[in-house]
Amino acid sequence: DTQTAPRLKVYWQPGCSSCLKTKEFLLENGVEFESINVLEDETGFRDLEALGLRLVPVVARGSDWANGAVFRDVARIAGFKWQPHDMLAPGEIVIRTKTILTAAGRYLAQIPEAQLDTMLPHRPRSYRQLSYHIFQIPQVFLDHVENDEPYTYEALISQLPADINTRDDLMHYARLVQGRLSRWWATKGTSTDFNQPGNVYYGEVSLHEVLERTAWHSGQHSRQLMLALETIGI
């Protein structure tokens, strides 16, 4: 009975690119939902704890929930048929990722050292942490495909290593990740089976989907960094 079915809820937090993508997906499909910012709504945070969850985005209807990053699962919870989009070929995604990272490096180079610890609006994350996170995303992907390291939610938390302190440190790290991505694609990427399971924390997806998410995830945050430049008048 749709009249008594629990309302669809989306749990999110500001500055979360996956959260934005999840809400856009539901809106594009004409789905109404209750939007719950877990940083401001303690009830929402407790709802997630009751489900045994400590991450966002989450789409839930009662006790039935899905990680917002997996659209086929989101569609199931929301009650409509999921129509997968045509993904770009892996090589094209890698090219786009390189373009995104190059742009992010330019944005980072323009942020004054004294502004790096400025916080993003409504989110406990600094420009320094955001810059690191943009390049951390492909690093976690590479650690996963090259070294079989677990692709976990914790691995993507933007906690800077002790040896990354200055803007120059960040830019050096950025160059290392970019070089590593290029080498991986040139040596192993072209022969990788992207239809294999992605083996990631957020659901059952292919490695192709994980690669695609790597590109748009870094891309969304790069746009945030570009807006940060506007905010500080650059």
Regions found by a protein language model. Name each.
Residues 20-27, 49, 105, 182:
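Class I S-adenosyl-L-methionine
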Residues 55-67:
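A short, hydrophobic beta-strand/beta-hairpin element that forms part of a small beta-sheet core
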Residues 115-160, 196-234:
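Short, contiguous alpha-helical
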Residues 70, 75-98, 137-180, 184, ...:
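Short, helix-capping/interhelical loops that line the mouth of catalytic, cofactor-
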Residues 1-32:
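Local sequence-structure signature of Cys/Sec-based thiol-disulfide redox active-site neighborhoods
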Residues 99-107, 130:
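Charged/polar low-complexity intrinsically disordered segments, enriched in acidic residues
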Residues 31-44:
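Thiol-based oxidoreductase modules, predominantly thioredoxin-like and allied folds used
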Residues 42-50, 55:
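BRCT (BRCA1 C-terminal) domain core and associated BRCT-interaction motifs
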